[in-house]
Amino acid sequence: MNLRPLHDRVIVKRLDQETKTASGLIIPEAAAEKPDQGEILAIGNGKILEDGKVRPLDVKVGDRVLFGKYAGQTVKVDGNEVLVMREEDIMAIVQK
Protein backbone atom coordinates (compact mmCIF):
# COMPACT_ATOMS: atom_id res chain seq x y z
CA MET A 1 0.00 0.00 0.00
CA ASN A 2 1.34 3.40 -0.88
CA LEU A 3 -0.83 5.65 1.29
CA ARG A 4 0.59 7.72 4.14
CA PRO A 5 -2.08 9.32 6.31
CA LEU A 6 -1.57 12.90 7.44
CA HIS A 7 -1.52 14.24 11.00
CA ASP A 8 -3.76 12.23 13.36
CA ARG A 9 -5.34 10.01 10.72
CA VAL A 10 -4.92 6.25 10.51
CA ILE A 11 -5.66 3.64 7.85
CA VAL A 12 -7.59 0.63 9.10
CA LYS A 13 -8.44 -2.67 7.41
CA ARG A 14 -11.74 -4.10 8.65
CA LEU A 15 -11.42 -7.58 10.11
CA ASP A 16 -13.75 -10.29 8.82
CA GLN A 17 -16.76 -10.89 11.01
CA GLU A 18 -18.15 -14.29 11.90
CA THR A 19 -20.80 -15.36 9.39
CA LYS A 20 -22.16 -18.06 11.69
CA THR A 21 -24.09 -17.54 14.92
CA ALA A 22 -23.36 -19.44 18.15
CA SER A 23 -26.29 -21.76 17.37
CA GLY A 24 -24.87 -22.57 13.91
CA LEU A 25 -27.06 -20.35 11.71
CA ILE A 26 -25.25 -18.85 8.74
CA ILE A 27 -25.76 -15.11 8.31
CA PRO A 28 -26.00 -14.02 4.65
CA GLU A 29 -23.46 -11.35 3.70
CA ALA A 30 -26.22 -8.87 2.83
CA ALA A 31 -27.70 -9.15 6.35
CA ALA A 32 -24.42 -9.03 8.25
CA GLU A 33 -23.37 -5.76 9.84
CA LYS A 34 -20.00 -4.32 8.92
CA PRO A 35 -17.40 -5.28 11.49
CA ASP A 36 -16.39 -2.69 14.03
CA GLN A 37 -12.90 -4.10 14.51
CA GLY A 38 -9.89 -3.59 12.34
CA GLU A 39 -6.13 -3.65 12.07
CA ILE A 40 -4.06 -0.49 11.77
CA LEU A 41 -2.16 -0.51 8.46
CA ALA A 42 -0.59 2.97 8.60
CA ILE A 43 -0.53 5.99 10.92
CA GLY A 44 0.14 9.70 10.50
CA ASN A 45 2.85 11.68 12.28
CA GLY A 46 0.59 12.82 15.11
CA LYS A 47 -1.95 15.39 16.22
CA ILE A 48 -0.92 19.03 15.88
CA LEU A 49 -1.71 20.81 19.15
CA GLU A 50 -2.74 24.46 19.53
CA ASP A 51 0.81 25.43 20.53
CA GLY A 52 2.14 23.89 17.29
CA LYS A 53 3.70 20.84 18.94
CA VAL A 54 2.97 17.38 17.56
CA ARG A 55 1.59 14.72 19.91
CA PRO A 56 2.42 11.19 18.72
CA LEU A 57 -0.48 8.79 18.25
CA ASP A 58 -1.36 6.17 20.86
CA VAL A 59 -1.96 3.48 18.23
CA LYS A 60 0.71 1.78 16.15
CA VAL A 61 0.79 -0.27 12.96
CA GLY A 62 -0.51 -3.78 13.62
CA ASP A 63 -2.79 -2.81 16.54
CA ARG A 64 -6.27 -4.34 16.55
CA VAL A 65 -8.80 -1.61 17.32
CA LEU A 66 -12.50 -1.05 17.96
CA PHE A 67 -14.32 1.81 16.25
CA GLY A 68 -17.87 3.06 15.74
CA LYS A 69 -20.16 1.73 13.05
CA TYR A 70 -19.99 4.97 11.04
CA ALA A 71 -16.36 5.90 11.77
CA GLY A 72 -14.03 6.89 8.98
CA GLN A 73 -14.23 7.21 5.23
CA THR A 74 -14.11 4.08 3.06
CA VAL A 75 -11.61 4.19 0.19
CA LYS A 76 -10.36 1.57 -2.27
CA VAL A 77 -6.62 0.99 -2.48
CA ASP A 78 -5.21 -1.66 -4.82
CA GLY A 79 -8.69 -3.19 -5.07
CA ASN A 80 -9.11 -3.48 -1.28
CA GLU A 81 -11.45 -1.39 0.88
CA VAL A 82 -9.83 0.37 3.82
CA LEU A 83 -11.00 3.05 6.25
CA VAL A 84 -9.29 6.38 6.76
CA MET A 85 -10.21 7.80 10.17
CA ARG A 86 -8.95 10.09 12.88
CA GLU A 87 -7.41 8.54 15.96
CA GLU A 88 -10.22 10.07 18.04
CA ASP A 89 -12.71 7.82 16.17
CA ILE A 90 -10.99 4.75 17.67
CA MET A 91 -12.65 3.66 20.91
CA ALA A 92 -10.17 1.04 22.13
CA ILE A 93 -7.14 -1.08 21.36
CA VAL A 94 -7.85 -4.81 21.67
CA GLN A 95 -5.25 -6.33 24.01
CA LYS A 96 -3.81 -9.67 22.92
Curated annotation (Swiss-Prot):
Q: Where does this polypeptide localize?
A: Cytoplasm
- What's a GO biological-process term for it? chaperone cofactor-dependent protein refolding
Q: Which InterPro entries match?
A: Chaperonin_GroES, Chaperonin_GroES_sf, Chaprnonin_Cpn10_CS, GroES-like_sf
Example GO molecular function term? protein folding chaperone
Q: Does the keyword Cytoplasm apply?
A: yes
Instruction: Describe the subunit structure.
Output: Heptamer of 7 subunits arranged in a ring. Interacts with the chaperonin GroEL.
Q: Which family does it belong to?
A: Belongs to the GroES chaperonin family.
Q: What is this protein called?
A: Co-chaperonin GroES
The scientific name of the source species is Janthinobacterium sp. (strain Marseille)
